[in-house]
């Protein structure tokens, strides 16, 4: 509802600016949907929690299709910056049966809070991205860096709106996942870092308690270590 011609013109102008900020590496409209809570609402409506299933959350504007396929245990951190982390888990159905051959598409921001496509002249292409395939037992593991909280892009109309409404633009530390397997519905989700700043005020309303995980100090980066910690 527009109460005046001026408000209508302002709305048209702002949405035009939003479109002009989009390109093949940045989707300002997705970002707008995220910060308005629309993405989270649509996710909640379309992906109601199923018993024993991992909860979903927003996709975000920086997913890249055709990320490189990686060998199990490979490091997705190409520039060696950041605090090393060993990530592991197990993909199962809702009855706990392991799923072999599930694809796990992961991506994250670097220690400075930027995704590779935001810094094409700074980060290696496809830095902190990779696709892994689960083994017979449904398990996966890989090396990366511990995620940190970061600000969403504020150099466009979405940033202007955020600041005009007195909100902060920050997201808590997280790792993105898309998990898919033949015969199963894909899951778009995050794993958030327990204790991270902004868990209770995520700028895009993506946090769910079940998706918060603790990072523990580890000396061994092997599949055996993953077995020990998950047992």
Model-identified regions with their sequence ranges:
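A short, solvent-exposed loop/turn motif at the edges and junctions
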Residues: 146-173, 178-189
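Short beta-strand edge segments in extracellular beta-sheet folds
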Residues: 192-196
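Single conserved hydrophobic/aromatic residue that forms the stacking wall/gate
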Residues: 1-8, 12, 221-230
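Beta-strand-rich domain onsets/edges
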Residues: 16-117, 203-206, 220-223, 231
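Extended, solvent-exposed segments with strong compositional bias
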Residues: 131-135, 139-153
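Short, acidic Ser/Thr/Gly-rich low-complexity loop/linker segments typical of extracellular
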Residues: 113-139
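Compositionally biased low-complexity segments at domain edges in trafficked proteins
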Residues: 208-220
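Residue-level preference for beta-strand/loop junctions
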Residues: 2-4, 83-84, 126, 171
